[in-house]
Design a protein with these regions (language model features):
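A polyanion-binding, active-site-adjacent surface
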Residues: 12-212, 219-226
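Sequence termini and other peripheral, non-core segments
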Residues: 1-3
Length: 226
């Protein structure tokens, strides 16, 4: 895969916002490194930018920002923290859904967060690929300029957006993009759902987001999974 081919995987509606912010060389280097990877890469290449396909730039109301895809076959589906229905539920998903159930109905057996993405929640990771069996294995492969550009594109849109960075890499990415909690955007950082310190469990992030939206006289986000 060439750099141009990699860039061509980005949905057209997002390309215009990213053009000029990520040098061509960055795409070329990233494509080369991905091509040199000897292990299986998750998810499949057609799903690397799935988050952008499902949630258009103009439709983004919130961004849940994670670290990287699941390194187990069949679990990564191109949406941060989401697992196809019918797959084993990772502990991180279990914890996320337990918190979401404080706000809305979560049907038993649901693990895919696709309905959230369709409602304007961009489910993005700071790194969009992972080698089989090694979480964080592509953290330094070159995705950072691309995902940073995506965050800046969202932040530059008119209207308020809620940014929910979960984990240190996600919080750092929001900081690099210059996104601040203030009069326009809402930033609700948290530990990663798998972290033991500063427990995600019981933190009610979804209720907090909806309360912040209420204060801005904006519609709440529907976190249900029917």
């Amino acid at each position: 895969m060439t750099g141009d081919q990699l860039r061509g995987l980005i949905p057209v509606g997002w390309q215009g916002a990213i053009d000029g912010t990520v040098p061509k060389m960055e795409f070329e280097q990233l494509a080369r490194r991905l091509g040199e990877e000897q292990r299986d890469i998750f998810p499949a290449s057609e799903q690397w930018f799935r988050a952008l396909e499902v949630t258009s730039l103009t439709a983004v109301r919130a961004v849940i920002l994670g670290q990287d895809p699941y390194p187990t076959e069949g679990q990564a589906e191109g949406l941060a923290f989401s697992v196809p229905d019918g797959q084993d539920m990772p502990r991180s998903v279990e914890r996320i859904l337990n918190e979401a159930a404080r706000e809305d109905t979560i049907a038993p057996g649901r693990t895919s967060l696709l309905p959230w993405a369709r409602r304007g929640v961009l489910l993005l990771n700071t790194t969009l690929t992972v080698p089989r069996g090694q979480a964080g294995g592509h953290a330094k492969i070159g995705w950072q300029p691309v995902t940073d550009a995506i965050l800046r594109a969202v932040a530059s849109q008119p209207g308020s957006v809620v940014f929910m960075p979960w984990g240190a890499p996600a919080r750092e990415a929001v900081g690099r993009a210059g996104i601040l909690d203030g009069h326009l955007h809402v930033v609700c950082p948290s530990v990663h759902p798998m972290e033991r310190r500063g427990s995600f469990i019981g933190s009610n992030p979804f209720g907090y987001v909806n309360e912040r939206l209420r204060r801005l006289d904006l519609a709440r986000i529907d976190w249900s999974l029917d």
